[in-house]
């Protein structure tokens, strides 16, 4: 048992070292991102960590907190002239939530606003594909975290949202 734990510990240290070597992407343009946790979702720890890392890259973040409706988020993104929306959804209902967000942005003529999301393992791979095929910019999965690390995911989000 000790050997197994020490191997896992070594692997975790290697992963941390790899993640530390990722240089934060610095945007070329002014980038504004609205962050929130979805309606009926009180799990805001992940989005709070992510927003702080996003802010550290020089991006302006408008954070709405948890338990936010699609209309609240979309209206804020439009009013604040945001480049993107970054959401977490750990409570289920994410397919309807993200699709409604996309549809509402289209309806309001805000097609330039990109939508990013994540929900740990709650959003299944086939649902991620369905949402991205629908028009959601990116849904991050646990494998993305393992492959890219947190800073790598933030870099991807900020770089994709970095447009004039």
Tell where the protein language model's regions lie, with residue ranges.
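Aromatic (phenylalanine/tyrosine) cluster motif
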Residues: 2-3
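Cationic, low-complexity basic patches in intrinsically disordered or flexible, solvent-exposed regions
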Residues: 14
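Short hydrophobic segments within beta-strands
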Residues: 34-36
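Non-catalytic signal-transmission and effector/linker regions of two-component phosphorelay proteins
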Residues: 17-31, 163
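A charged, well-structured terminal subsegment
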Residues: 147-164
């Amino acid at each position: 048992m000790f050997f197994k734990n020490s191997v896992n510990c070594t692997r975790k240290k290697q992963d941390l070292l790899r993640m530390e070597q990722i240089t934060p992407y610095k945007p070329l343009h002014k980038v504004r991102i609205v962050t929130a946790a979805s309606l009926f979702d009180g799990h805001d720890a992940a989005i709070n960590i992510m927003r702080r890392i996003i802010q550290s890259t020089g991006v302006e973040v408008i954070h709405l907190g948890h338990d936010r409706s699609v209309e609240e988020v979309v209206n804020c993104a439009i009013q604040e002239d945001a480049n993107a929306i970054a959401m977490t959804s750990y409570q289920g209902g994410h397919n309807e939530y993200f699709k409604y967000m996309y549809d509402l942005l289209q309806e309001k003529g805000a097609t330039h606003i990109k939508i990013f999301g994540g929900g740990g393992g709650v959003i299944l791979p086939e649902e991620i594909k369905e949402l991205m095929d629908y028009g959601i910019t990116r849904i991050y999965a646990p494998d993305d975290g393992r492959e890219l690390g947190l800073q790598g995911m933030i870099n991807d989000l900020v770089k994709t949202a970095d447009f004039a």
